[in-house]
C-alpha cells in the first residue's frame, strides 16, 4: 500500500476535533512521543542562588524593529532552519540557548543586541 499524503491530509481536514484528539493520543502511544510544547526550565532553587553562576540561559525578550537581522543571528547561533528561527523570534520571549558558559552567553547576547534584539541572561 503506497502512502498518499494528499489523501491523509484530506481525511484530517474532514475529521472532527474529537477525532483529531484521539488521533494525536494514538500517535503518542504508538511512537512513544508527546505533542506537548517544551516547557521552560524552572529557576534555580534558593541554595544555588547565592553561588556564582557558571552557566546561563539566553532569553530573547523582544526582536525589536529589525526582525530579519535577528532571525539571521538566531539561525547562526542555534543552527535552526529559517522557519524554526522565525517562529522562535516571533514567539519572544523565548529561550535561544540553555546552559551556556558565561563567556558564550555574553557573546550571544552581544550578537543579538547588535542585530536589534532585547536579550536577558538567566
From Swiss-Prot:
Keywords: Ribonucleoprotein, Ribosomal protein
Function: Forms part of the ribosomal stalk which helps the ribosome interact with GTP-bound translation factors. Is thus essential for accurate translation.
Subunit structure of this chain's protein: Homodimer. Part of the ribosomal stalk of the 50S ribosomal subunit. Forms a multimeric L10(L12)X complex, where L10 forms an elongated spine to which 2 to 4 L12 dimers bind in a sequential fashion. Binds GTP-bound translation factors.
GO BP terms, alphabetized: translation
Organism: Streptococcus pneumoniae serotype 4 (strain ATCC BAA-334 / TIGR4)
InterPro entries linked: Ribosomal_bL12, Ribosomal_bL12_C, Ribosomal_bL12_C/ClpS-like, Ribosomal_bL12_oligo, Ribosomal_bL12_oligo_N_sf
GO CC, one annotated term: cytosolic large ribosomal subunit
Keyword Nucleus annotated: no
GO-annotated molecular function: mRNA binding; structural constituent of ribosome
Similarity section: Belongs to the bacterial ribosomal protein bL12 family.
UniProt-recorded name of the protein: Large ribosomal subunit protein bL12
Amino acid at each position: 500500500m503506497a502512502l498518499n499524503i494528499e489523501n491523509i491530509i484530506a481525511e484530517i481536514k474532514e475529521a472532527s476535533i474529537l477525532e483529531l484528539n484521539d488521533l494525536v493520543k494514538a500517535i503518542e502511544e504508538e511512537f512513544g512521543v508527546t505533542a506537548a510544547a517544551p516547557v521552560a526550565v524552572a529557576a534555580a532553587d534558593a541554595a544555588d542562588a547565592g553561588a556564582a553562576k557558571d552557566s546561563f540561559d539566553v532569553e530573547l525578550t523582544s526582536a525589536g524593529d529589525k526582525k530579519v537581522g535577528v532571525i539571521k543571528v538566531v539561525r547562526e547561533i542555534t543552527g535552526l532552519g529559517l522557519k524554526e528561527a522565525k517562529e522562535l523570534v516571533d514567539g519572544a520571549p523565548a529561550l535561544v540557548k540553555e546552559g551556556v558558559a558565561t563567556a558564550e552567553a555574553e557573546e550571544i547576547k552581544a550578537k543579538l543586541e547588535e542585530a536589534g534584539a532585547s536579550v536577558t541572561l538567566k
